[in-house]
């Protein structure tokens, strides 16, 4: 053995000995042995959430991994998730911030990444009590129904022409239309208007950058060099989206000044203008602009992904599709666009959405958390600064929680009261605790109404009947986990 090989072997043995003794001494959660420099990154594969789920069966629901130089604990059970998100929610309220999120100082202004403090509480209060309150949702329902009608008209045109619909594309445009109507009262007369497509292009750009693996996130020493150009590209897309949103806000402010006696619109923009004009307001315009950015990027990408999964599962399971159609027919009759007030009378539709969220949480590892101080959980030490990932995908596929967990069986939710609103830790696609997704009330309504509109008015078939579905084609891990190949299905009247 030459001297270099001997030195390398001695280094590896020394590092391994130090690592093992250090872990035992500090009683860290168990986990796979990390390689020098790269840690466990080479073990992750294309679907990290699936890899973590498999490893957790060996190492347990609290598991240590090293992602480059970033020490991380993976949480894979409802019991441990509740400990992290509820019992020790204050300790684990911090965020690990990806380099892309530093674009336009988003990490310093966004409610999603701000530390828990006065600014965060003020923004959270605005979301809960004003923007996403039940009354606010009710007031803006009419605007969303108009956008659902545009989706229906688009599907009718495709049906008449025998043309397939790219469900991801249609869901993305519809979600943007629903959100822009709710936020801005945008009155675009076309399904795929120029403004909507501009939003789409920018948001897809943001999502592609935020979702791409970035070496600088795992090796912070590289951040000043931005080797993959992630920060530079993120600055461009974040800047464009913020400028677009600011334009709408300024237009509304000027309109209010020019016509102070004009009736107010039932949208979020009116709420934001009122907040800015309030004497006791402590927030700046930038806080509200970045809040809107979070809503557009987070809401459109995740809702789009989930709608595509719902439609795939229903097309793949005609018996479940028939049950949803029968329920919608009995409740809606000849009405074409569902009213949001009918949702409590559609338990099977609700069960379908829950089952899809269980199998396909759009963000399978949720947004990363960070320990703000040392904390012992389940007998293991989680040191200050540790990144914590909640594997919602693993909990949704856990055979100790769910019977036949890989099967699409909405009926399982007809016999229990489990919901995805953050109280039942078996099903937490929107997170839980103080960091739960603030836009969940709007996302919940969009998922149900878009699905109902598509299913109630048409039968559906694959563009290529011989085409395999996603389980055989693979999925793409990124900002949201979606199909590798877009779902293309043909609407028709049976």
From Swiss-Prot:
UniProt pathway annotation: Secondary metabolite biosynthesis; terpenoid biosynthesis
A single BP term in Gene Ontology: terpenoid biosynthetic process
Keyword Cell wall biogenesis/degradation set for record: no
Alphabetized CDD domains for the sequence: CYP76-like (cd11073)
Assigned EC number: 1.14.14.65, 1.14.14.60
Main enzyme class: oxidoreductase
Recorded topology in the membrane: Single-pass membrane protein
Localisation per UniProt entry: Membrane
Protein name: Sugiol synthase
